[in-house]
Amino acid sequence: MGEFSATILAASQAAEEGGGGSNFLIPNGTFFAVLIIFLIVLGVISKWVVPPISKVLAEREAMLAKTAADNRKSAEQVAAAQADYEKEMAEARAQASALRDEARAAGRSVVDEKRAQASGEVAQTLTQADQQLSAQGDQVRSGLESSVDGLSAKLASRILGVDVNSGGTQ
């Protein structure tokens, strides 16, 4: 630290020996030279560097605006497509429901028709069976009636021990 203090002390003595000086509040020629160089660099930057950067930034901003517009348009198209989809699905569901109802009605009519046909066949079969049973009953009745006379005579002959048909005794 001693060396550093010695350097500062030597610099301050050299400034005092130089005759005293310059006031930093009063501009000197160096200030104007630096100011002119700064203005030239500023002009060069504003003339050749800033316009391309501004152009690129403007293009980027336009591209972002276009992308945002495209996104909005796409969102609207998606919403419209979704609405169309829902509409078509509702129509398809309605058509499917109508087709199901028609198929059920057709099925019921076929079932009713087959039931009526089966009922008719059953009635016809019952009528035929009734006729057959009546005919068989008549045949059996006539057969029994014809055999009753012979059987009753035979039974009477057995019980009485006399031949009933011939009128004699056994």
Curated annotation (Swiss-Prot):
Residues 122-139 have a biased composition (Polar residues). The chain crosses the membrane at residues 25-45. It is a single-pass membrane protein. Residues 121-147 are annotated as: Disordered. F-type ATPases have 2 components, F(1) - the catalytic core - and F(0) - the membrane proton channel. F(1) has five subunits: alpha(3), beta(3), gamma(1), delta(1), epsilon(1). F(0) has three main subunits: a(1), b(2) and c(10-14). The alpha and beta chains form an alternating ring which encloses part of the gamma chain. F(1) is attached to F(0) by a central stalk formed by the gamma and epsilon chains, while a peripheral stalk is formed by the delta and b chains. The keyword Cell division does not apply. F(1)F(0) ATP synthase produces ATP from ADP in the presence of a proton or sodium gradient. F-type ATPases consist of two structural domains, F(1) containing the extramembraneous catalytic core and F(0) containing the membrane proton channel, linked together by a central stalk and a peripheral stalk. During catalysis, ATP synthesis in the catalytic domain of F(1) is coupled via a rotary mechanism of the central stalk subunits to proton translocation. It comes from the Bacteria. Belongs to the ATPase B chain family. Keywords: ATP synthesis, Cell membrane, CF(0), Hydrogen ion transport, Ion transport, Membrane, Transmembrane, Transmembrane helix, Transport. It is found in: Cell membrane. InterPro entries: ATP_synth_B-like_membr_sf, ATP_synth_b/b'su_bac/chlpt, ATP_synth_F0_bsu_bac, ATP_synthase_B_chain. HAMAP family: ATP_synth_b_bprime. This is ATP synthase subunit b. It comes from Mycolicibacterium smegmatis (strain ATCC 700084 / mc(2)155). One of its GO terms (cellular component) is proton-transporting ATP synthase complex. GO terms for molecular function: proton-transporting ATP synthase activity, rotational mechanism; proton-transporting ATPase activity, rotational mechanism.
